[in-house]
């Protein structure tokens, strides 16, 4: 069957065409337009529009784009409820069927709206949900700078801002974008104030667990500065985070022995925690010592003599530590190690290093000038 193109006709005729088409597909809708006006027609059309989603993609996109075009010409105060209704239909249709089509329709709606229209928030959230259901987050703009701009442009309330960032975080995690997800969660937690930080307990808890679980995350000190995380001080989750921030392996082992059920309840695997704490402990040792004996490593990291070389190789692969093995003297020679924490002492060290470089460059400059004068 040929589907009407819905162009070059009045809005009223377009609505009537849509009504007739939907009724022909089995929808319970009158073919006559409502006396209440276009927004009432659209409300009734959107209510039953999912019947046409059974058709082939080309036909559906034509019909649904017609609905979108009519939505976009409505006054802003009449758009919001209708757009929310349409988004709900597209998100929930048949438990995730035809995601690419629904993504395209939502994208057409999103990009067809004025950039500062607040209801774009609803459409963007719907895009994220559909993208998550089919692992297609790469087709949705998720850059944090862009999301920040939208939050400002749409003048979102605090609750909506938190809802958006929380949803974005969940979607990124589901789609295996752990690095980006971590940045979004830090953004979310950083948006709380002293007054409402207590409301972010669940988010802060999830943030800590996700960071500890992530095999590619090794630095955690920035989390301690977040107000919602500070609110957890005195709780086991905060104690555990503090261990991963600056303590040694022996401290984690003691914590685990006393709180095994708690670790298990978080969904954290003890052996993975041990592996990460061994690396973190080694990083701390490498910052303080340029040479570390095998015996010291065996004792501090609780590993056997035969495991030292394999451990060092794995540590170097993380790029958190740069070192080489001296088999003859049974030691590890460190060239560089990332600091687990970066506070006043580290800033002073950086200042001293840069100042030394500056002085050396001045000496080179003066030497070159003296040579040019001779």
Swiss-Prot record:
* Entry keywords, A to Z: Cytoplasm, Initiation factor, Protein biosynthesis
Q: Can the keyword Cytoplasm be found in this entry's annotation?
A: yes
Q: A cellular component term (GO) from this record?
A: eukaryotic translation initiation factor 3 complex
Under SMART domains, the record lists: PINT (SM00088)
Q: Which GO terms describe its molecular function?
A: translation initiation factor activity; translation initiation factor binding
Q: Which residues form the PCI domain?
A: 180-339
Q: Which Pfam families match?
A: eIF3m_C_helix (PF18005), PCI (PF01399)
Q: Where is the protein situated, by its record's location annotation?
A: Cytoplasm
One GO biological-process annotation of the entry reads: formation of cytoplasmic translation initiation complex
Q: How does it assemble?
A: Component of the eukaryotic translation initiation factor 3 (eIF-3) complex, which is composed of 13 subunits: EIF3A, EIF3B, EIF3C, EIF3D, EIF3E, EIF3F, EIF3G, EIF3H, EIF3I, EIF3J, EIF3K, EIF3L and EIF3M.
The entry's family comment says: Belongs to the eIF-3 subunit M family.
Q: Which HAMAP family match?
A: eIF3m
Role description: Component of the eukaryotic translation initiation factor 3 (eIF-3) complex, which is involved in protein synthesis of a specialized repertoire of mRNAs and, together with other initiation factors, stimulates binding of mRNA and methionyl-tRNAi to the 40S ribosome. The eIF-3 complex specifically targets and initiates translation of a subset of mRNAs involved in cell proliferation.
What's the protein here called?
A: Eukaryotic translation initiation factor 3 subunit M
| Species this protein is from | Gallus gallus (Chicken)
